[in-house]
């Protein structure tokens, strides 16, 4: 799972704050076996206390990957297995290599801990020798556009599937230093040289000024014939590693 949030608000309180506009596709009770969670940073729409607690109750031995500065909090919440990494650090667990990658964002959960923990993306690589299985997955997390992100493509030249955010970008004068917009998402798709991508970070919470469905509309307008897929919440797609076609 990536940055799981199953509750109705992305907020320290379930009484106020950004409210979920689209229900989760599955409840925690309906999930299949989950072995790993990767966390990109500590903002409330990415790191949710109640979701983590309930996931730990169902999957007590789950391994949680976090950027620097978050391990202590996850252990306090009841996690048994937490791995904390700096940018470009990597760890291999059960045949999967997890690498924390740079992002351009920020962190806080109150006025008193701004940028006290790191933010990152994650590259997950499998060493399974199967030509049809995805071998390299890149979860971008939250980031604005930065030319430095090209370094990720240099270090990981064969990204099978990228999870690229497209929402929470308006107004640009304020959000351009925090989140990419759909046009930049397409630019990053090209610069990463990934085989295919799925759009994330849209359609669930109203976090910025754009309408909830605008990110998808703009991505459809910009992406052309690229294998950059939009999946509605509750939908699913099978990705073929060889030709990046949706089956």
Feature-to-residue mapping (PLM):
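Glycine/Thr-rich phosphate-binding loops of Rossmann-like dinucleotide-binding domains
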Residues: 10, 47, 108, 172, ...
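Conserved N-terminal glycine/acidic-rich loop preference
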Residues: 27-34, 40-48, 73-88, 139-140, ...
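Conserved beta-strand elements of the Class I
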Residues: 1, 35-38, 99, 123, ...
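Pre-active-site segment of Zn-dependent metallo-hydrolases
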Residues: 1-42, 51-54, 69, 108-114, ...
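Short hydrophobic/aromatic-enriched beta-strand-loop microsegments
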Residues: 2, 63-64, 80-89, 160-165
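Active-site metal-binding loops of divalent metal-dependent hydrolases
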Residues: 4-6, 42, 103-105, 141-143, ...
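Cap/insert and terminal regions of metallo-dependent hydrolase folds
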Residues: 28-31, 36, 51, 63, ...
